[in-house]
From Swiss-Prot:
Record lineage: Bacteria, Pseudomonadati, Spirochaetota, Spirochaetia, Spirochaetales
Protein function: In addition to polymerase activity, this DNA polymerase exhibits 3'-5' and 5'-3' exonuclease activity.
Record's protein name: DNA polymerase I
A biological process term (GO) from this entry: double-strand break repair
Name of encoding gene: polA
Keyword tags: DNA damage, DNA repair, DNA replication, DNA-binding, DNA-directed DNA polymerase, Exonuclease, Hydrolase, Nuclease, Nucleotidyltransferase, Transferase
Organism whose genome encodes this protein: Borreliella burgdorferi (strain ATCC 35210 / DSM 4680 / CIP 102532 / B31) (Borrelia burgdorferi)
Signal peptide, first to last residue: none
């Protein structure tokens, strides 16, 4: 029997648009292509898996349908398609026409009507029809010759009568009657109000059809009878609306044979940066001949008695993954790697702790769709001695190959701590993905699906809970690990082109990858922590907490657990009967809630103080000691290069960037961080770098002159705002000016500024206006920057780092305002981050070139912390001053402040 496949285009389009809505794929013009790429990915999957002889892709009519004419409220509650989706529908139609893939639409009818009519006509002509859509309306077309399929997790699920009965409680032939009763909220079909899914199923089980129900009203229970009588008109109207038109005048099925695909669509894929689609189209759709020469050895060499056995090769239609289990095979592989232009490396380990993890295996790829796995251990079996593998890889690393990795920082440390001498990566796909879209996820699984339309083998599908990678079969280990290396290599090729298209390749290779080398070493350096000092300070905080707790209990008159949110809630809102301000979470007792209650009871101030001290104690004095590495006796944080949208790095496990500095308690915690072996800490930070960048970008002569004259910018601003001499500026006036200076960077509203300064909204508005009068070009810069982002869709730092801000054109005022704040902040904070990275790379390289023992330990926003031998102190200060102040040329001087101390707490 001949087969026909019918596809509901808009269903696939909308589904793909929304599934990636928060992580949009963008072409080189900054346009969203989620739906475009997702649609063709799905279509090519269908064609590859089903190989249909006849296929029709249907679209809704662009003019109102007969249902809209009959019932004007039909689909009236639906939102209009998003602005960035509408053009994608046009591109999809254009692509289908270019590829010569049959499409069909008819004025006045929906795609579902076309599908129903084609299905009926096909059945009459002895076709077996498959409709691919999850739409429940189409279930009414089901028959012996018409099957309904939906796609889930890369597989086809038939929605047969058993499926319908289980999901809706009725048979497929009753779907129209069922929908007439329950209605359809998405289409605004009324149905019978008051009768739900369960009631509808029960009625149809007994009376079979809608007509059958109305013919037996006298024996139906009173409640349902009254509803049925009241809603009769809506019931039969709904029946008409859900009934699909099966008798439209449509062309013959033979006109829709799927053949003679055209390559014209490839130019459209190139235009919209759909590189993976081009490969899929050529390989799976055009059915080009694939290279299938019989390889006589692992690397197309002459056959030898030591070539890899077939049993160690995993061949599928698309990939070739192999395990390396003999010394000869490893020698062969290493020699080939020495000739390779790029090498992707991934490691498998016993844990994620890079200091204690055992290396289980290494995977390699240097050609797309190929991968090689070298097991250190598999199922308790040792194939090649570890020392031999180390020797061979160290020999490879000496040739300085270009290493590719996905978060290779982890693999580098694993290799190093397992006896290898690895070299830093040439390219990291995680960093590249982050640069291409700072708002996107960057995990390998996500990137594979996003850019390659490929679902990776899941780790949890390979490793059982609490099991170890060393315990799985060699075949499974080879498949899983080789795939990671292969996917990373494929992503590298895509990202290399994408970075060049987006003009991000310079940022990648001249800043981010050299900086990656710096943070690898920073993580290895770690920082010494005085455990005894921290323990004693923890005891001191504990005593202070106990005293505050006693005061609170005495004030309230009830003994309760201050660390129990439930008990705290009962005390505050039931015992003390405090009133929670509007818009506050009713069940919350977090710090914001407590601050809002400050004026209502004398104990609230102490509760806030208790919370703050308890957090310091649990986060730092209690926790940091537990994180000290027993091998190095130092604390090793992890720096994340791909987290913030502005380009700043973050510190985790533990977060050393959030230790308070403005209060005495935070400074005391910092005092626990000390140099070792008689060394000294040297700190360097930029003086007002964000305001310096604002002056540079805005070209405001007044602000530039203030920097050139090395003036205190906040005092200068206060003088202009309050129109008094600088010598008359009080600390409070300077504080106001400082808030306004940074408020401008963060696009602070007059309302928020008023709240921060404790003044009226009118006064705050006056300060902002006065500020722009004093620095006129700053206002002009802000307006121009927002307009640039509106047109381009992204902000851009001075070094071309992009941040896509789609909400900048939102119709929602709050969304748009937030996007405007992000637009200004991103260019300033992002540019500061860029300059700091350049400076750190220069300092790092200078230390290396001079073979100095000094090392960079931490970076906290605009500050760099160095541990240095006393004898190198002056040289380090000189290097920091020169390298930081010449990192990037602005239209005004960059200035670095240098301080020293015997602990981190002594600095600042």
């Amino acid at each position: 029997m001949k087969e026909l496949y019918l596809i509901d285009a808009l269903n696939i389009i909308f589904r793909n648009y929304h599934v990636m809505k928060n992580y949009p794929l963008l072409n080189t013009q900054g346009e969203n292509v989620n739906a475009f790429i997702g649609f063709f990915k799905t279509l090519f999957f269908i064609i590859k898996e089903k190989n249909p002889e006849h296929l029709i892709i249907t679209f809704d009519s662009e003019v109102p349908t007969f249902r809209k004419q009959k019932y004007p409220s039909y689909k009236a509650t639906r939102d209009l398609p998003p602005d960035d989706l509408i053009p994608q529908i046009g591109w999809i139609k254009e692509g289908l026409l270019k590829a010569k893939i049959p499409i069909f639409e008819m004025e006045g009818y929906e795609a579902d009507d076309l599908l129903a009519s084609f299905a009926k006509k096909a059945a009459k002509n002895n076709y077996l029809t498959y409709i691919i859509s999850p739409d429940k309306d189409l279930l009414q077309t089901m028959s012996e010759y018409v099957k309904i399929l939906k796609i889930e997790n890369n597989s086809f699920i038939e929605m047969d009568n058993e499926y319908v009965t289980k999901k809706f409680g009725v048979n497929s032939f009753q779907i129209k009657d069922y929908l007439a009763i329950v209605g359809d909220r998405s289409d605004n079909i009324p149905g019978i109000k008051g009768i739900g899914a369960k009631g509808a199923a029960n009625l149809l089980r007994e009376f079979k059809t809608l007509d059958g129900i109305y013919s037996n009203l006298e024996i139906i229970n009173k409640k349902h009878r009254e509803l049925l009588i009241k809603e009769k008109e809506n019931a039969f109207l709904s029946y008409e609306l859900v009934s699909l038109e099966e008798n439209l005048k449509i062309p013959e099925i033979e006109n829709f044979a799927l053949k003679n695909f055209s390559e014209e669509i490839i130019s459209l894929f190139e235009k919209h940066s759909a590189i993976a689609l081009i490969k899929t189209y050529k390989k799976d759709i055009l059915k080009q001949e694939k290279e299938n020469a019989d390889q006589k050895s692992l690397f197309k060499q002459e056959p030898t008695t030591n070539s890899l056995d077939d049993i160690n090769t995993i061949d599928t239609e698309n990939v070739k993954y192999r395990s390396i289990t003999t010394k000869i095979e490893l020698d062969d592989l290493i020699e080939s790697l020495k000739k390779a232009k790029y090498i992707s490396i991934d490691t498998e380990t016993s844990s994620l702790d890079t200091y204690t993890a055992k290396l289980i295996g290494i995977s390699i790829s240097f050609k797309e769709f190929e991968g090689y796995y070298i097991p250190i251990e598999a199922k308790g079996k040792i194939y090649i001695e570890k020392n031999y593998i180390i020797q061979k890889f160290n020999n490879l690393f000496e040739s300085n190959p270009k290493i590719i990795g996905q978060n290779y920082k982890f693999d580098y440390k694993i290799l190093k701590n397992n006896g290898f001498n690895p070299i830093p990566p040439y390219f990291d796909t995680m960093i590249a993905a982050y640069l291409i879209d700072t708002n996107s996820k960057v995990s390998l699984d996500f990137l594979a699906e996003k850019y390659l339309m490929h679902k990776n083998i899941k780790y949890e599908d390979v490793i059982q809970k609490n099991d170890n990678f060393a315990n799985i079969s060699l075949e499974m280990a080879t498949s899983y690990s080789s795939e990671d290396a292969d996917i990373t290599f494929r992503l590298f090729n895509i990202f290399t082109k994408k970075l060049k298209e987006d003009k991000l390749d310079k940022l990648m290779h001249e800043i981010e990858m050299p900086f990656n080398k710096v943070i690898i070493e920073m993580e290895e350096n770690g920082i010494y922590l005085d455990k005894e000092y921290l323990k004693e300070y923890g005891k001191e905080l504990g005593k202070e907490l106990e005293a505050i707790e006693n005061e609170i209990i005495k004030s309230i008159g009830i003994d309760f657990n201050l660390n129990s949110p439930k008990q705290m809630h009962e005390i505050l809102f039931e015992k003390l009967n405090l009133k929670l301000p509007e818009k506050m979470k009713k069940d919350s007792t977090d710090i914001k809630v407590l601050e809002s209650l400050r004026e209502q009871h004398e104990s609230i101030e102490n509760l806030i103080k208790y919370r703050q001290i308890a957090k310091l104690k649990s986060t730092y004095t209690d926790n940091l000691i537990e994180l000290i590495n027993y091998k190095t006796n130092r604390l090793h944080t992890s720096f994340i290069q791909t987290k913030t949208a502005t380009g700043r790095i973050t510190s985790i496990n533990p977060n050393l960037q959030n230790i308070p500095i403005k209060d005495e308690k935070g400074r005391k915690i910092r005092k626990a961080f000390k140099p070792e072996n008689g060394n000294i800490f040297i700190s360097a930070d930029y003086s007002q770098i964000e305001l310096a960048i604002l002056a540079h970008l805005s070209q405001d002569e007044v602000l530039i002159k203030a920097f050139e004259n090395n003036k205190d910018i906040h005092t200068e601003t206060a003088s202009k705002l309050f129109k008094i001499e600088e010598k008359e500026i009080t600390p409070n006036l300077r504080r106001i000016a400082k808030s306004i200076n940074f408020g401008i960077i963060y696009r602070m509203s007059d309302f928020r500024l008023a709240k921060e300064l404790g003044i009226t909204k009118e006064e705050a508005k006056g300060f902002i206006n006065s500020y722009f009068d004093s620095y006129p070009k700053i206002k002009e810069f802000i307006i121009n920057q927002i307009n640039f982002v509106r047109n381009a869709g992204y902000s851009e730092t001075i070094l071309k780092r992009r941040r896509y801000i789609k909400e900048i054109n939102s119709n929602n005022y709050l969304e748009r305002s937030a996007a405007e704040r992000i637009a200004i902040n991103s260019i300033i904070q992002g540019s500061a981050a860029d300059i700091m990275k350049i400076a750190m790379v220069k300092v790092f390289n200078e230390f290396k070139s001079k073979k100095m023992e000094s090392k960079i330990l931490l970076q906290v926003h605009d500050e760099m912390l160095i541990e240095s031998p006393i004898e190198e102190e002056n040289e380090v200060k000189k290097i920091l001053k020169i390298m930081m102040e010449t990192a990037y040329t602005l239209n005004l001087p960059l200035r670095a402040n240098i301080e020293t101390g015997k602990s981190w707490g002594e600095i600042h």
